[in-house]
């Protein structure tokens, strides 16, 4: 059984969804039989590599969604508590907003080497917890090495247009399946889990799909 997961490394609910999915897998008797593939999706593909409010995530979201600064801050505070409930530490005050394509190119390279999950995990943590700049080449090289890639792998991912094409094709494929937001889990192209659903909901879907 194959699980495809569309995700953006700048999406706070995608990291939470990853944790909930992992919790569901721990309870799923056939977890070892699953093939899991991460897919790229950008929530804001038109974002500049260095946006105007790079060091102010609250202002960025307020401007993009039409919220007040206070509303944006309150929403993020709620997400921090949600993340904490699944064992994640979110430091939005340190987050550096940037276009996520470079990160997705790294993920595409990592997938080819069987390191897709490791790449997602490390890049999520780099952005939400560590306050890393995911547009900075040296930072991406260091993160790539932690994932299990070489400096040459990272350079190849960031310079060869095929990796951008792979990421963009993932997004197009998701749209064809009805994707409107992330995280988006597709189980054997039969069932979909939309959003960071609870482990119980995810487990129920996995068991239903496995039963045929």
What function would you assign to each model-found segment?
Residues 3-6, 13-30, 38, 100, ...:
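C-terminal cap of thioredoxin/glutaredoxin-like
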